A protein has these predicted regions:
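Hydrophobic alpha-helical segments and helix-packing faces
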Residues: 169, 216-220, 302-306
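Membrane-cytosol interface segments of multi-pass membrane proteins
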Residues: 1-196, 330, 350-387
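Structural signal for membrane-spanning alpha-helices in multi-pass inner-membrane proteins
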Residues: 59, 93, 126-130, 201-202, ...
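Active-site environment of divalent metal-dependent phosphoester hydrolases
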Residues: 62-64, 130, 213, 229, ...
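Aromatic-enriched alpha-helical transmembrane segments of multi-pass intramembrane proteins
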Residues: 4-18, 44, 48, 54, ...
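Alpha-helical transmembrane segments of multi-pass integral membrane proteins
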Residues: 7-22, 79, 87, 122, ...
Length: 387
């Protein structure tokens, strides 16, 4: 871990400089939205951008540096970020399946191209550069398991990339989704997936070191499916719920909408800051008496409620944050590479002021993500043509 030197300005001022720089960047990138849908692609990308930033900041604060007050409060919502990714995945897959049913094998082929091609490129790169520059050699079985998407643990400095635990968890949903999907009852598929995910996480049949992370993220994917089902519109008919929400967003009561957005933002901020059982002692006591695991229940509930508030905010706002959109476009690439780059090959935190290092890493992730897409996109097209 890196011990930061905050110099004469101190930790608090360092955090405020970073926050101010990000706020200015967000405001400069603000544009009037061109979309009319509630959850169009630009909004999805903005949410993914927000999610990956929350994850990156948390990994810096709680894993990379010794002082976990660094980047507070930007660093407290990694779990919310993971839930946003799972929610958007469930939402997007359900929207696609409701428009055009896809056979299971075709679904798997497309997931293989979208997820595994970038994953394989990054893994091969990391295995090679770690061996050449760090003389760190991974066991053949470990490399094979990684290439198959199996990451049963999340050891920050021992695994090739500890955040890859998410890949294995996501693959479970991907494997089950086309097998259980019911076009007339996607809500039932969502419930079945949530039940399976909770059973797997609670029973932990394989006794996985990473299960504590699985238990915090069992329901977001299914919630995305349910929202997609609730907002779907059939040919020749309009969805009354969608029409009411659009009318509220675009209608003549902006003050009410602004007040709602403000309240939701405050709720999201409060829940993100109070996400432990110790923050809700009476609820924790009641859950414990009912033989629920209060830590996981409260941790997941506050994360999902925070996520829900943010999704409503982004759906009802009439402006776009191009900065978040850009990070959303390269969110998967940033996810794949940010931790090993910072943990093993960092130069910025070691040689730059603490306030400047994360502000340099962020555009670096965009540039690296752009480069990785330039490599993986033609590879994916080749696989799509020949497989």
């Amino acid at each position: 871990m890196i011990e930061l030197d905050f110099g004469s300005i101190g930790l608090a001022v360092t955090n405020w400089i970073i926050i101010a720089a990000l706020v200015v960047t967000l405001l400069v990138s603000l544009r009037k939205t061109q979309s009319v849908d509630l959850l169009p692609v630009p909004v999805s990308q903005e949410l993914k951008g927000l999610a990956i930033l929350a994850i990156v900041f948390a990994h810096i604060s709680y894993m990379l540096v010794t002082d976990n007050h660094f980047l507070y409060p930007l660093s407290i919502a990694a779990g919310v970020g993971v839930d946003i990714f799972l929610f958007m995945s469930g939402f997007g897959l359900t929207v696609g399946m409701l428009k055009k049913r896809m056979p299971a094998m075709e679904f798997y082929r497309r997931r293989l191209i979208k997820v595994f091609i970038p994953l394989w490129v990054v893994l091969i790169l990391l295995f090679a550069v770690d061996a050449v520059f760090l003389q760190h050699y991974y066991a053949p079985l470990y490399m094979l398991q990684s290439l198959l998407g199996w990451f049963p643990r999340a050891a920050a400095f021992d695994d090739v990339n500890s955040p890859f635990w998410y890949i294995s968890w996501l693959l479970m949903f991907y494997i089950l989704f086309p097998l259980l999907f019911m076009p007339q009852r996607p809500w039932l598929t969502a419930i079945l997936l949530a039940v399976i995910a909770n059973i797997v996480a609670v029973t932990d049949p394989l006794d996985l070191q990473v299960d504590w992370l699985h238990r915090l993220h069992t329901n977001a994917f299914s919630l995305g499916m349910i929202v997609a089902w609730a907002l779907r519109e059939s040919k020749g008919s309009r969805n009354p719920l969608v029409e009411k929400l659009k009318a509220f967003r675009d209608g003549g009561a902006p003050l009410v909408r602004y007040l709602l957005l403000l309240v939701l933002a405050l709720v999201a901020g409060y829940l993100a800051c109070h996400n432990n059982a110790s923050d809700w002692p009476h609820l924790a006591q009641a859950l414990h008496a009912a033989r629920f695991d209060e830590s996981f229940f409260i941790g997941q509930a506050t994360s999902l409620l925070t996520m829900a508030a943010l999704i409503v905010i982004f759906s009802l706002k009439r402006m776009e944050f191009k900065f978040l959109y850009l990070f959303g476009v390269y969110s998967f690439e940033t996810y794949l590479l940010h931790w090993p780059l910072m943990a093993r090959y960092d130069v910025f935190f070691h040689h730059l002021p603490a306030w400047l290092a994360p502000l340099i890493w962020l555009p670096a992730f965009i540039a690296i993500g752009w480069l990785l897409q330039k490599i993986t996109t033609p590879l994916g097209a080749w696989f799509d043509k020949h497989i």
